[in-house]
Amino acid sequence: EFERQRAKTITALAALDADVIGLLEVENNGYGQHSALASLTGALNKVSAKPYRFIITSEQPGDDAIKVALLYRPSSVSVEGKAAMLLAKPFDWGSRPPLAQSFRHLASNELVTVSINHFKSKGSCPKDAADVNAEQNDGQACWNTLRTQSAKALSDWLHSQPTGVTTDKQIILGDLNAYRMEAPLQYLEQNGWQHLAPKDAVHSSFVYRGRSGTLDHALASPQLKAKLQQFHQNQLFLRSFEQLQPSLDQSWNQ
């Protein structure tokens, strides 16, 4: 099953053909030869005409089982400044420490800082109903306060130019575990970050228990004029939901 899932992931990443890729939920087992990140990058490079490298942080990215990561193509972009992580509250628990790295696009000489993020999910709610992160019955589920604090801290951090490279072209990518009209996204948009999807866009980034929604986002600083094209890694629905010929259905279920 691991090999099957990894092959699907490699196919999706190769099809992106991107110069910089943000990754979520990577096993947090370092950057060595046998680490999950090194293994994934190596497998991707076997099918990619332009090889990738991964960003290595000087600090341990938290103590969670998973982390965020960045891949880049040295043939298209150069690494500028340092790899920066925010480990202080509210990223010491729940929301994974964000990773930021500046890159120079070799063809245009433009600088951009890319931040990959993974905010606390809506699950595993606090047992104490008086907890500020408990379900408030406002449609935002639990841990909304933590996610909003994460959005504020992330915005302030990026404005401080954490990579040591000064650029007004910055982008926030990742799973913010919040819908666009919820407090974390509203804070970011009200504080200068521009969502790269039109407000009336009909799109989704996941399907869960038969319902689709968008918890994954891309927001840019006003100075960064970028085009966003959504790329679904998986089909929205399993093929078993379709009406298949018995022979095809039998083959698929083997």
Residue ranges and their predicted role:
Residues 1-254:
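Divalent cation-coordinating acidic motifs and surrounding scaffolds
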